[in-house]
Curated annotation (Swiss-Prot):
PANTHER family: NAD KINASE, NAD KINASE 2. Pfam families: NAD_kinase, NAD_kinase_C. This is NAD kinase 2. Keywords: ATP-binding, Cytoplasm, Kinase, NAD, NADP, Nucleotide-binding, Transferase. NCBIfam families: PRK02649.1. Its cofactor is a divalent metal cation. The gene is nadK2. Belongs to the NAD kinase family. GO terms for biological process: NAD metabolic process; NADP biosynthetic process. The active site is at D77. Its EC number is 2.7.1.23. Gene3D superfamilies: Probable inorganic polyphosphate/atp-NAD kinase, domain 1, Probable inorganic polyphosphate/atp-NAD kinase, domain 2.
Length: 307
């Protein structure tokens, strides 16, 4: 039996808990492999060296493979995103424990760790699959950069904000011209992140959709677009200035030159979340983002007793 641990090495609590979880598992006969969240951070390229290419399948840490029953993630949302970039190709289900701040993507808190681990070891859990994206940058019809994304891909001007022009092909539909500070291409999971702040809708996780959200568009008619996740997307920068920057899940970036093309499609891999209770997305929205809460106290609606 093999299990894994991914932890945020920059947080002393996560480091301490990782060692604790390892001891618990090894005492029960599990083979345990550990890796840090930094392994899923792709880093940023530089204008004078715009290519920083790590193939998707080369991010899998040593010892982690498809035979692993599960892995425990100890950190915040950034560590969860990093863990899935590393482990999604192996389809390892992850138990996510929040040692960070918001923890929108985590299943439990530190106080829940040991009961949650016991529940997983008993096999008393379900798995929720989430859509991921494959993001590729092509230059002269050759892939020069790629990454997995659970939340979103963003393209904007670098280093200052300013109007950008894009031509976008969604599936076989007519090409769309967009003038905006940038573009966000988001999964349903990412619809509660940057896309939400940019005015995009919240999409429940089970919907087979993606969304394209312009950032501060220079048009009253330019709005977020929701479309089937089976449709690939091509983005062509149409800008007189030299560089744009492409960012995946807030931490991995690649400079985009005017002749480059960006190709995004639903990834062949899934983010597999271990759920200890039936997922209730609206409850998470209320708890984490304050959505749907009453502004004033009001009496409950009563069922009519009239015949």
């Amino acid at each position: 039996m093999k299990a894994g641990i991914i932890y945020n090495e920059g947080k002393p609590l996560a480091v301490e808990l990782a060692a604790h979880v390892r001891r618990i598992l090894e005492l029960q006969g599990w083979e345990v492999h550990m890796a840090t969240g930094i392994g899923g951070i792709l880093g940023y390229s530089r204008p004078d060296s715009p290519v920083c290419h790590t193939p998707i399948d080369q991010l899998v840490p040593p010892g982690f493979d498809a035979s692993m029953a599960f892995a425990v993630v100890l950190g915040g949302d950034g560590t969860v995103l990093s863990a899935f970039r590393q482990l999604a190709p192996c389809e390892i289900p992850l138990l996510t424990i929040n040692t960070g701040h918001l923890g929108f993507l985590t299943e439990g808190y530190v106080a829940d760790l040991e009961p949650a681990l016991d529940q997983v070891l008993r096999g008393d859990y379900t798995i929720e699959d989430r859509t991921m994206l494959t993001v590729q940058v092509l230059r002269d019809q050759t892939v020069i950069w790629e990454a997995l994304s659970l939340n979103e891909m963003v393209i904007h001007k670098e280093p200052l904000t300013g109007m950008c022009h894009f031509e976008v092909d969604v599936g076989a539909h007519a090409r769309v011209d967009i003038a905006a500070d940038g573009l966000i291409l988001s999964t349903p999971t990412g619809s509660t992140a940057y896309a939400l702040s940019a005015g995009g809708p919240v999409i429940t996780p089970g919907v087979a959709a993606l969304q394209l959200v312009p950032i501060c568009p220079h048009s009253l008619a330019s709005r977020a677009l929701v479309f089937s996740n089976s449709e690939p997307v091509w983005i062509y920068p149409a800008n007189p200035f030299k560089h744009l920057i492409l960012v995946v899940d807030g931490n991995a970036g690649c400079y985009i030159q005017p002749e480059d093309q960006v190709f995004v499609q639903r990834a062949p891999y899934r983010a597999r979340f271990i759920r200890l209770r039936a997922p209730e997305f609206f409850h998470v929205l209320q708890q984490k983002l304050g959505w749907g809460l009453p502004h004033v106290a009001k009496p409950r609606a009563k069922k009519s007793t009239d015949s």
